[in-house]
Amino acid sequence: MHLMNRSVLMLLSMLVLSIATSAANALDDEHWDKAQKCIAKAITFLQTTQADDGSWTSQPGPAITALVVNGMLDQPEIDATDPYVARALKYILSQCKEDGSIHGGILQNYNTSICLSALSRVNNMPQAATAIAKAQAYLKGMQWKDQPGPDGKPITTNHPFYGGSGYGKHGRPDMSNTQFMIQALHDSGLNCNDPAFQRAMVFITRCQGVAQNDLLGDVIVPDGGFIYATTTDKDNLEPSTKSDSITVDDKDTGKPVSLLRTYGSMTYAGFKSYLYANLDRNDPRVTAAREWIGKHYTLDCNPGLPEAQKLQGLFYYYMTFGRALNAWGATTIDTPDGERDWANDLVDALAKAQQKDGSWVNAASRW
């Protein structure tokens, strides 16, 4: 998602604030009040920037508007009858296609997934109910499973694409697209025992630095974190990370080897997806991801990225951070510096970064 603007940056932050405030037992009174003030300013900013057609910027598609709707509906005083939300829902539904996708011409998976999550918040709207069912089916059809791959041969369980989802019907799968798909299927009530969840777990595990990774366990740093994708692109089946490679000593030979480094936003995305799929909390993959999170706990940057890029994806990182830890359910995280109240820390970081007009802007060039 490279086409994000000021409104989207603000909305990613607002979503995280909503998640933090929804976990009331994780916030003390001071931080609850601080969060409410930030949210009020954010909503005012949104209300003054909605387009006449009900959208908040039509590019790169209706997903941005759906993010706004999701954030607004997290507030107890706002429902689908709110005039801003009602106009936005009308716009989102106008982007529904016959095949079940919801988009404006590009980024079909991202747009459909985020719109499905938003529509799932709406009750007693027949048009939304129809769109939800069709969007679920579309996303499940987009997932790589048995369709022909780039070489024309059917994808099987041992293929690096298996279980993942990419930007479009024939797109190379990655952790980001896949986690948004899982988020949408979870939000719209799909049973976690559905084959779509189970297939996704295969792909997600193959992006993690754990012994259970049966495909790439020897090329990812075995620290429990996640890389971006199992392949570089559809023509290059080498794995890909947005971080970099590092040299470590091989655990068996003791000789130095170059391995792919894991990083923050994808690790929280993978951890969250495991929880949505209802993996056992003591599953070694879940434990490894949780331990990575504790070891690399920070809200100052997207941990694991190179120094020059460490602020890239910061607001995306905040979103996955908040959603994942909210799904985990604990109010604190064990870190090398002791227990941290993650929701309080998140509110502090967002309150400090909020602009006077209620928006947020990342100092780095990429959201």
Model-flagged regions — what are they?
Residues 25-41, 52-84, 98-137, 141-348, ...:
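An alpha-helical repeat/solenoid feature that recognizes helix-turn-helix modules
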Residues 1-12:
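Bacterial N-terminal signal peptides that target proteins for export
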Residues 3, 17, 23-26, 97:
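Intrinsically disordered, low-complexity peptide-like regions
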Residues 10-20:
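Bacterial N-terminal signal peptides
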Residues 89-95:
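Active-site-surrounding "flap" and adjacent substrate/cofactor-binding loops of secreted or lumenal enzymes
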